Amino acid sequence: MIYIIYRYRYCLVYTMDIFKELILKYPDENVLISPVSILSTLSILNHGAAGSTAEQLSKYIENVNENTPDDKKDDNNDMDVDVPYCATLAIANKIYCSDSIEFHASFLQKIKDDFQTVNFNNANQTKELINEWVKTMTNGKINSLLTSPLPINTRMTVVSAVHFKAMWKYPFSKHLTYTDKFYISKNIVTSVDMMVSTENDLQYVHINELFGGFSIIDIPYEGNSSMVIILPDDIEGLYNIEKHITEENFKKWCGKLYTKSIDLYMPKFKLKMTESYNLVPILENLGLTNIFGYYADFSKMCNETITVEKFLHKTFIDVNEEYTEASAITGVFMTNFSMVYRTKVYINHPFIYMIKDNTGRILFIGKYCYPQ
């Protein structure tokens, strides 16, 4: 039990760190990532890391392993994400390395199916190989991770993808879906298909902080997962939440959730990224500088000098009346309107959303601010 709690804490710190870096980089765009997919990929890299590279990775990885029970320390699958049943969840991570490099048997034994050698000189074939793998692992929801061939001097490329599908515990009634306004800002308004689900007992809280008020609602799926939505009271109030969302604050806010009868109005949306995130600059900003470039030390992988050239991540989400299907995270927005016993929650302006399992581990996290 100590091991699980310790692991969750570091996963949450890492999640908030990388999410805040991304929303700073893309302040006016929808943001969508899968923290567990990225973290498990870093765990794979950690098996081959040494020296200062291993020290930097230990900020997010080694602190977990130090508290792993002795009988699990040599488990070949210790980089895998332990996710309880929550309908369909497929996490796809792969390391592609040059076929001219001879890797240590101990490293290959640990990473198993997450590793593949390729001929980077055949750039188009390698691109198609990677894209076909991603398409298969995401059930066809992401057709391509690479839009152009990799440089022929590439030595190693890390890719990650994830596919999630779960039915709502309280489905929205299709016949109640209607066209409503979505406020991108106070002066910019568009239309969305608004889904409706009434008289459901959900976890909910309204928080008042010095930087503004906001609501949090936890919407369950069948199984052991749920969607958490953070909705500012002010149409343009999401920026203040983004500045203050940390591991400590998020745990504090969610600790105040209580059961309440809710009428929920939530936009139906589908989000598909046209370009992959290259997470190299994001990870460097978080202190993982020695994974990339001259100082990278992956001597536990092989005897040659090798470095990560690209760290790619791409996401997809489909939120409708029956289910959420994602190659990333889903999102919702909320505002209150008090009645005698029920609260009406209208998700009609920018919000943060997450999908988590019942241990609190965040599988997906995103920001929805612009209907596509």
From Swiss-Prot:
Entry keywords, A to Z: Early protein, Host cytoplasm, Protease inhibitor, Serine protease inhibitor
Predominant localisation class: host cell
Location within or outside the cell: Host cytoplasm
Superkingdom as given in the UniProt entry: Viruses
Residue ranges of coiled coil: none
One family name in Pfam for this protein: Serpin
Annotated site residue numbers, Reactive bond: 337-338
CC per GO annotation: extracellular space; host cell cytoplasm
GO molecular function: serine-type endopeptidase inhibitor activity
UniProt function note: Plays a role in mediating viral host range. May act to inhibit a caspase independent form of apoptosis to allow efficient virus replication in infected cells.
UniProt family annotation: Belongs to the serpin family. Poxviruses subfamily.
The protein, known as: Serine proteinase inhibitor 1
Organism: Variola virus (isolate Human/India/Ind3/1967)
